[in-house]
Amino acid sequence: MPDIGLEEVEIIEILVSINEKIAPEQGLITVEGDKTSMEIPSPISGIVKHIFIKIGEKIKTDALIMRCEVENIDFHVKKKEEICLDNNVLNKVEKNFKKDIFFHATPLIRRLARNLNINLYDVVGTGPKNRILKEDLDLYQSNIKENLIEEKNKINFGDSKKSKTKELELSDIQKNIGNNLHRNWMNIPHVTQFDEVDITILEKFRQKYNNEKRNQKKTNENITILVFIIKVVAYALEKFPIFNSSLNINNKKIILKKYINIGFAIDVNNDLFVPVLKDVNKKNIKQLSSELILLSEKARTRKLNIEDMTGGCFTISNLGGIGGSWFSPIINSPEVAILGISKSQIKPSWNGKEFIPSLMLPLSLSYDHRVINGAYAARFITFISRVLSDMHFLIM
């Protein structure tokens, strides 16, 4: 049993059998210890002759696990004059040989490095006995990207190009948002799920309601489609509580929130603000509409305070008024998901007898894959689509 940095491990799987031919780096056994499991690879090629361990047994470093018959090796020694090499070549061979000897990485890490096109010799291991961990690969990849960005920023366009370019200063808001977006994109494994929902009935009701209020001269405030989406999302968060959570990376725990506050992104002269509607699940459509209008106006006049922009559980990014079909919104940490809304379009849909025109709204759901799996996300966005297509589900 090789030294993998753990005092004792349990055998949970034996991957080979007696008389089986094995190759270097082929997995022999799978062990588990200290809340992690890994494959132990073969250092040689040969044939398995005896297996000394069994599943469930606990073993320590240097324990005998298998006996193998090593394939024949050609020990033919060439003549003295044939093996005289330049000192520089010998030094290079010796250097690489030493690297191979003291190289510490599990097969999983080796495969991951190959997939990421990372040379493990360039990675500094921070695990026990300098073992290379997944976090070391993440750090190495992050440093590479930062170096590329630095090099890109150093591009010199030359004197002939200077008259054809113009530099613009980023506003303080753009700088802060840019830093947050970069950090969230680098640290959160994003997955984006897409769906399309029929809002024909909902839009007819919305227009009818606004026309009646306008004719009665009770209000000049129109209820937007966004208000209905916010209310439905709050309902979905109650049904799918993992979406209303945060991930505590330090102690590896998910923090579920007992309140539902929903932020909505708003663009003001290329500056992005995310006001937060509080306790959405406890308010009706008219209350939410009034608060949405108030916060939107405060954003446009740049009068939002800290209370208006903190405490969010989930964010909605609405680009429907601008255009576009789909996009991948970036999660607003410490939240674990964000819903993107695009421009609705009339499309043909089949009602079982014929094609009819339907108003279809594109939805884009990005979520943190460390917390939420694909099936759970699919159920969440499907639930939102079903309720938006028939608001009667809100009273169920």
UniProtKB/Swiss-Prot annotation:
Residues 1-69 form the Lipoyl-binding domain. Keywords: Acyltransferase, Lipoyl, Transferase. Residues 104-141 form the Peripheral subunit-binding (PSBD) domain. The keyword Transferase applies. GO terms for cellular component: cytoplasm. GO terms for biological process: pyruvate decarboxylation to acetyl-CoA. It comes from the Bacteria. It comes from Buchnera aphidicola subsp. Acyrthosiphon pisum (strain APS) (Acyrthosiphon pisum symbiotic bacterium). Forms a 24-polypeptide structural core with octahedral symmetry. Its cofactor is (R)-lipoate. PANTHER family: DIHYDROLIPOAMIDE ACETYLTRANSFERASE COMPONENT OF PYRUVATE DEHYDROGENASE COMPLEX (PTHR43178), DIHYDROLIPOYLLYSINE-RESIDUE ACETYLTRANSFERASE COMPONENT OF PYRUVATE DEHYDROGENASE COMPLEX (PTHR43178:SF2). Its EC number is 2.3.1.12. The pyruvate dehydrogenase complex catalyzes the overall conversion of pyruvate to acetyl-CoA and CO(2). It contains multiple copies of three enzymatic components: pyruvate dehydrogenase (E1), dihydrolipoamide acetyltransferase (E2) and lipoamide dehydrogenase (E3). The active site is at H369. It holds the Pfam family Biotin_lipoyl. SUPFAM superfamilies: CoA-dependent acyltransferases, Peripheral subunit-binding domain of 2-oxo acid dehydrogenase complex, Single hybrid motif. The modification N6-lipoyllysine is found at K35. Binds 1 lipoyl cofactor covalently. PROSITE patterns: BIOTINYL_LIPOYL (PS50968), LIPOYL (PS00189), PSBD (PS51826). Belongs to the 2-oxoacid dehydrogenase family. GO terms for molecular function: dihydrolipoyllysine-residue acetyltransferase activity; lipoic acid binding. It catalyses: N(6)-[(R)-dihydrolipoyl]-L-lysyl-[protein] + acetyl-CoA = N(6)-[(R)-S(8)-acetyldihydrolipoyl]-L-lysyl-[protein] + CoA. This is Dihydrolipoyllysine-residue acetyltransferase component of pyruvate dehydrogenase complex. InterPro entries: 2-oxoA_DH_lipoyl-BS, 2-oxoacid_DH_actylTfrase, 2-oxoacid_DH_E2_comp, Biotin_lipoyl, CAT-like_dom_sf, E3-bd_dom_sf, PSBD, Single_hybrid_motif.
